[in-house]
Swiss-Prot record:
Residues 206-290 bind DNA. It comes from Mus musculus. The modification N6-acetyllysine is found at K172, K176, K268. The gene is Rpa1. The keyword Cell cycle does not apply. There is a cross-link at K22, K88, K172, K176, K192, K229, K253, K268, K276, K340, K419, K467, K562 (Glycyl lysine isopeptide (Lys-Gly) (interchain with G-Cter in ubiquitin)). As part of the heterotrimeric replication protein A complex (RPA/RP-A), binds and stabilizes single-stranded DNA intermediates, that form during DNA replication or upon DNA stress. It prevents their reannealing and in parallel, recruits and activates different proteins and complexes involved in DNA metabolism. Thereby, it plays an essential role both in DNA replication and the cellular response to DNA damage. In the cellular response to DNA damage, the RPA complex controls DNA repair and DNA damage checkpoint activation. This is Replication protein A 70 kDa DNA-binding subunit.
Length: 623
């Protein structure tokens, strides 16, 4: 039984720091360590059959093995990947990055052999003496089986028993001279590469090898204390992730050199407590570049992971606090066109686009892209979207906003994306989806997801609750009421109040309390739309009316004044044209009479491919 473990492996791991070996060890004990609000960490006491060591730490991505009961006291496991970290006081910690449980705790049932605590001061001779003493007095577990043959160590190195090689497929002998694991910076001093998870503000000399998963644009500021600029990075290695920020001179120095998805050695930055309000990075600390910071390319970093996600289900967003930062993954069920808006705080124009993401829960969330992300987004093939660090808003339910610090990946190469794509292609695309976002003030009202026929909207009493309801439908225009559909409005940008003709060449706006030599036309169009089953009167304001008529309001105003016949033809040509309508319905009371008011929020040409696909899916669902 003792031969089943990689005897001598602990010494090789600690003394030689040879991380290429894959030892087979037994878990003796597991102890959780409190980490505040972070994910729990687990400290392990492990045995190689010869020695025990309590300085094993489990990487957080392996926590599920403990929490699921696979990794437990007495189980035997093979370590596939580990890192040795030297603490400030000289003690060494082995961080287990990847391991496989070979025999469960139930199958093993007890401690294998009589291992003794490992002491770094012991030489190999003392350990061999201990081993001989153990073999002379077999343990109850090993007395029942003949001792396994074990090759003698050669040139001062420890071998691994052949029984273990047969049982677990491990054949590489321990004791092979290990590399230094040191980085030689340009200054000539050696710095040890340490995992990100081990960084603390109390360390002065350190180097990490990390992949850049996100790089912000350069941002500037100006206030009473001066002005400056900055950019930030998100870095990841096998142990965790960290955010780094460069200011002023460091921006000029490092911004042109660092590329997203490349791997670099980072040395000597200032570490401080992280501000979680502005970052979704899972680390209690963040890094700031300074005059001593060094960044060197690493050509051998292909093994490092890419972006680390901790996904929140769309259905779980309703329990998240306002302004919380979350990682989300979903299929782009539908999307709006990019529009330009002016940010009031700095009077700067920026692009904005709403997309509607759905996951396997069938829930849909409105997600807003900004700037370059909004302009370049292509949702025509309904891609999988993974977003790290989106901000939760509570406006009208729950919605998300992508920040400048967020990471957006289209069709990421991760298992969750493949699973979601398979589900959507096989069954998800037939679902209407249930929106957790309710944009009551306009827009697409939560996305084109709540598909209804006009008959379904009426029979389900949509709009008769306390809040307005939204639905999407495909219908044809059957009648347009052109009488009084246009009015002369205040020409100022933010005012649409009807003006009064002063009969002296001026037009007065009561709201602005001003007179103007001109006006602009505004439109409120009543339309009757119908599908195969039902019809509905709807009100169309400026943009939706223009989309139906195919002409802008100013041109229509000129036609009405100069060419009544051409004006009539515009309305006639719009009849019997089909559109996809996004409609808001709400019960309103006027003069003691209650009725459902239907307002068109958005009008788009029918995507007949998508429409046909949904009809076929509905037919199959009802067969």
């Amino acid at each position: 039984m003792v031969g089943h473990l990689s005897e001598g492996a602990i010494e090789v791991m600690i003394q030689q720091e040879n991380t290429s070996i894959k030892p087979i060890l037994q878990v003796i004990n597991i102890r959780p360590i409190s980490t505040g609000n972070r994910s729990p960490r687990y400290r392990l006491l492990m045995s190689d059959g010869l020695n025990t060591l309590s300085s094993f730490m489990l990487a957080t991505q392996l926590n599920t093995l403990v929490e699921g009961g696979q990794l437990a006291s007495n189980c035997v496991c093979q370590v596939h990947k580990f890192i040795v970290n030297t603490l400030k006081d000289g003690r060494k910690v082995v961080v287990l990055m990847d391991l496989e449980v070979m025999k469960s705790a139930e199958d093993v049932g007890l401690k294998i052999g009589n291992p003794v605590p490992y002491n770094e001061g012991y030489g190999q001779q003392q350990q061999q003496q201990q081993q001989q003493q153990q073999q002379a007095v077999p343990s109850p577990a090993s007395a029942a089986t003949p001792p396994a043959s074990k090759p003698q160590p050669q040139n001062g190195s420890l071998g691994m028993g052949s029984t273990a090689a047969k049982a677990y497929g491990a054949s590489k002998p321990f004791g092979k001279p290990a590399g230094t694991g040191l980085l030689q910076p340009s200054g000539g001093t050696q710095s040890k590469v340490v995992p990100i998870a081990s960084l603390t503000p109390y360390q002065s000399k350190w180097t990490i090898c990390a992949r850049v998963t996100n790089k912000s644009q350069i941002r500037t500021w100006s206030n009473s204390r001066g002005e400056g600029k900055l950019f930030s990075l998100e870095l990841v290695d096998e142990s965790g992730e960290i955010r780094a920020t460069a200011f002023n001179e460091q921006v000029d120095k490092f911004f042109p050199l660092i590329e997203v998805n490349k791997v670099y050695y980072f040395s000597k930055g200032a570490l401080k407590i992280a501000n979680k309000q502005f970052s979704a990075v899972k680390n209690d600390y963040e890094m700031t570049f300074n005059n001593e910071t060094s960044v060197l390319p690493c050509e051998d970093g292909h093994h490092l992971p890419t972006v680390q996600f901790d996904f929140t289900g769309i259905g779980d967003l309703e329990s998240k606090a306002k302004d919380a930062l979350v990682d989300i993954i979903g299929i782009c069920k539908s999307y709006e066109d990019s529009i330009k808006i002016t940010v009031k705080s700095n009077n700067r124009e920026v692009a904005k686009r709403n997309i509607y993401l759905m996951d396997m829960s069938g829930k849909v969330v409105t997600t807003t892209l900004w700037g370059e992300d909004a302009d370049k987004f292509d949702g025509s093939r309904q891609p999988v979207m993974a977003i790290k660090g989106a901000r939760v808003s509570d406006f009208g339910g729950r919605s998300l906003s992508v920040l400048s610090s967020s990471t957006v990946i289209v069709n990421p190469d991760i298992p969750e994306a493949y699973k979601l794509r398979g589900w959507f292609d096989s069954e998800g695309q037939a679902l209407d989806g249930v929106s957790i976002s309710d944009h009551r003030s306009g827009g697409a009202g939560g996305g084109n997801t709540n598909w209804k026929t006009l008959h379904e909207a009426k029979s389900e009493n949509l709009g008769q609750g306390d809040k307005a309801d939204y639905f999407s439908t495909v219908a044809a225009v059957v009648f347009l009421r052109k009488e009084n559909c246009m009015y002369q409005a205040c020409p100022t940008q933010d005012c649409n109040k009807k003006v009064i003709d002063q009969q002296n060449g001026l037009y007065r706006c009561e709201k602005c309390d001003r007179e103007f030599p001109n006006f602009k036309y505004r439109m409120i169009l009543s339309a009757n739309i119908a599908d195969f089953q039902e019809n509905q009167w709807v009100t169309c304001f400026q943009e939706s009316a223009e989309a139906i008529l195919g002409q802008n309001t100013m041109y229509l105003g000129e036609l009405k004044e100069k060419n009544e016949q051409a004006f009539e033809e515009v309305f006639q040509n719009a009849n019997f044209r089909s559109f996809t309508f996004r409609i808001r319905v709400k019960l309103e009371t006027y003069n003691d009479e209650s009725r459902i008011k239907a307002t068109v929020m958005d009008v788009k040409p029918v995507d007949f491919r998508d429409y046909g696909r949904r009809l076929i899916a509905n037919i199959r669902k009802n067969m």
